[in-house]
């Protein structure tokens, strides 16, 4: 039978505390080193550091250089001299001016308007401004300006063709087919091939006047001109003091009817002062006084007491 008594008390040996190793560094990173490593792993930070830092350095150097007014002036002078020497090279110099599509008189006006002192660098010629100055001339409808190789400044113009003469007060003005001014005319005899228009607002209805003249071609040699009446309609003035009064609407058709009537009845060869076509299909004739008396006598009407 085993004994129930406890064994004799023995002291439990104590464990000695671990010795600290001296001279060895803790491999774990410090807090700031850890944060720096995490920041460096950020792509945006790496890009900003690799690109932004050199840019900031360059800007800082440039700012230090340009901080001096003398340095700025010296660099500006050097740059200007470099640009001038480049622009004045022979291959960029314009020595000739060519004007195509213009009459000799208009060509002289274009040269005087441009007033270029050649030779001149092509960089000193404003082509847009030169074109605007040329197109400001009344006789020029359109212009093209360009620099060609060989030092040639080429100007191509489309000249306005005079289509009619506008009598304004005591002056004669040449107009093109749209009513644009071309030039002044000293004497009517200088352009006997062109018809004359007159009256208030005549210059604004040139296309219609030209259509009327085209329809009146069979009697064109007798036409002295067209007069604008009330800025609404036209009167055709013929020789022998005759006048054809046209309607406001469809004046060309009225002229065509008049030509057909004249070819059938020789109407304009008679003693007629005016033909009023303002009422469609009802032309009204105004006879000369002596012709009217002859008609009355033929009808047996006494004209002895009449002044007509």
From Swiss-Prot:
Q: Where in the cell is it found?
A: Cell inner membrane
Residues forming the POTRA domain are: 92-160
The residue ranges for the Cytoplasmic side of the membrane come to 1-46
Membrane topology qualifier: Single-pass type II membrane protein
Q: Give TM segment ranges.
A: 47-67
Looking up PROSITE patterns in the UniProt record yields: POTRA (PS51779)
Its main localization is membrane
InterPro entries (alphabetical): Cell_div_FtsQ/DivIB_C (IPR005548), FtsQ (IPR026579), POTRA (IPR034746), POTRA_FtsQ_type (IPR013685)
Return the Basic and acidic residues bias intervals. 18-28
- Quick one: where's region Disordered? 1-28
> Pfam families from the xrefs?
FtsQ_DivIB_C, POTRA_1
Periplasmic compartment residues = 68-308
Q: What GO biological process terms does the UniProt entry carry, in alphabetical order? A: cell septum assembly; FtsZ-dependent cytokinesis
Alphabetic keyword roster: Cell cycle, Cell division, Cell inner membrane, Cell membrane, Membrane, Transmembrane, Transmembrane helix
Any one GO CC term of this protein is:
cell division site
Query: What does the UniProt record say this protein does?
Result: Essential cell division protein.
Task: Identify its protein family.
Answer: Belongs to the FtsQ/DivIB family. FtsQ subfamily.
Q: Which HAMAP family match?
A: FtsQ_subfam
The molecule here is called: Cell division protein FtsQ
Q: Which species is this UniProt entry from?
A: Cereibacter sphaeroides (strain ATCC 17023 / DSM 158 / JCM 6121 / CCUG 31486 / LMG 2827 / NBRC 12203 / NCIMB 8253 / ATH 2.4.1.) (Rhodobacter sphaeroides)
